[in-house]
């Protein structure tokens, strides 16, 4: 959701927003994931604005423990829990450990987490 933050209707967002360090790491890859100079500049600008606006929630030992529960829930549902999906699950584990809802544009990425994380599709 953070990549779309400036295009979302503020009325659909919570009053307070937190960002995980894992989300910031994902955002940091953006400028390096394109060869288009203009797109790289847009992504770098987005990264710098996010870095200035947020003090990210760390992926700490509580998050690591929560990741085990998140992974088990997803795997038990027969969904992919490794590879590129693992990043989404690390973000979900951070929200789980912090007791915070996870707002996302891609609710299907977080299916099978009922009871662990409140997923809010915006």
Positions of the model-derived regions?
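Histidine- and aromatic-rich ligand-binding microenvironments
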Residues: 20, 84-85, 106
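Generic detector of contiguous secondary-structure segments
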Residues: 7-9, 47-62
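Short, hinge-like loop/turn segments at secondary-structure boundaries
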Residues: 34-38, 75, 120-122
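Acidic, PIN/NYN-like endoribonuclease modules and their adjacent C-terminal/linker elements
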Residues: 92-122
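Alpha-helix capping/helix-boundary segments
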Residues: 1, 63, 108-109
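Active-site neighborhoods of divalent-metal-dependent phosphate/nucleic-acid chemistry enzymes
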Residues: 31, 55-101
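Short, well-structured N-terminal submotif of metal-dependent ribonuclease cores
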Residues: 1-48
């Amino acid at each position: 959701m953070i990549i779309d933050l400036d295009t979302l209707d503020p009325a659909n967002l919570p009053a307070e927003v937190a960002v995980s360090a894992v989300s910031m790491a994902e955002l940091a890859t953006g400028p390096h994931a394109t060869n288009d100079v203009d797109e790289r500049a847009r992504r770098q600008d987005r990264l710098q604005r996010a870095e200035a606006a947020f003090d990210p929630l760390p992926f700490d030992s509580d998050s690591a423990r929560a990741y085990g529960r998140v992974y088990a829930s997803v795997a038990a549902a027969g969904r992919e829990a490794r590879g590129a999906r693992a990043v989404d699950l690390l973000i979900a584990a951070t929200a789980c450990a912090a007791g915070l809802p996870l707002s996302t544009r891609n609710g299907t990425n977080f299916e099978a987490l009922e009871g662990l994380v409140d997923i809010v599709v915006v």
